[in-house]
UniProtKB/Swiss-Prot annotation:
Expressed in which tissues: Red blood cells.
GO annotation, biological process: hydrogen peroxide catabolic process
Role summary: Involved in oxygen transport from the lung to the various peripheral tissues.
Protein name: Hemoglobin A subunit alpha-1
Self-association and partners: Tetramer of alpha-1, alpha-2 and two identical beta chains.
Globin domain residues: 2-142
One annotated GO molecular function: oxygen binding
Chain positions recorded as heme b binding sites: 88
Species name: Aldabrachelys gigantea (Aldabra giant tortoise)
Top-rank taxon: Eukaryota
Residues noted as binding O2 in the record, renumbered to the chain: 59
Disulfide bonds: none
Length: 142
């Protein structure tokens, strides 16, 4: 899916609200992922997965920082996430479906904190953007 100028503007509007809460929203996104989709916990056997765990908070911040890179390079998401794609495909071997699950959780967290900006149109734009991110992250899988 191609992101239109309107989609890009909508994504940047969401990010203007989310970008200053990377650790908080990132950890909430991961906590939701682990509760709603418990099979995703298998990738984090060395983490304390309890609420407000420092490991989950740090990784949540890392995840949303990567999303921020995609927002900052919205015209070249594959290029911005190339190294991360290599890491997930070759070293971590994360099942690609998990990126979609994470995206769903991120939309819920974003909408919970900022319900007025997550209009249906913005939701569509965010879904398209997150789909492009997931596609970029899975581009190195064989």
């Amino acid at each position: 899916m191609v992101l239109t100028a309107g989609d890009k503007a909508n994504v940047k509007t969401v990010w203007s609200k989310v970008g200053s809460h990377l650790e908080e929203y990132g950890s909430e996104t991961l906590e939701r992922l682990f509760v709603v989709y418990p099979s995703t916990k298998t990738y984090f056997p060395h983490f304390d997965l309890h609420h407000d765990s420092p490991q989950v908070r740090a990784h949540g911040k890392k995840v949303l920082s990567a999303l921020g890179e995609a927002v900052n390079h919205i015209d070249d998401i594959p290029g911005a996430l190339s190294k991360l794609s290599d890491l997930h495909a070759q070293n971590l071997r994360v099942d690609p479906v998990n990126f979609k699950l994470l995206n769903l959780c991120f939309v819920v967290v974003s909408g919970t904190h900022h319900p007025t900006i997550l209009t249906p149109e913005v939701h569509v734009s965010l879904d398209k953007f997150l789909s492009a991110v997931a596609t970029a992250l899975t581009s190195k899988y064989r």
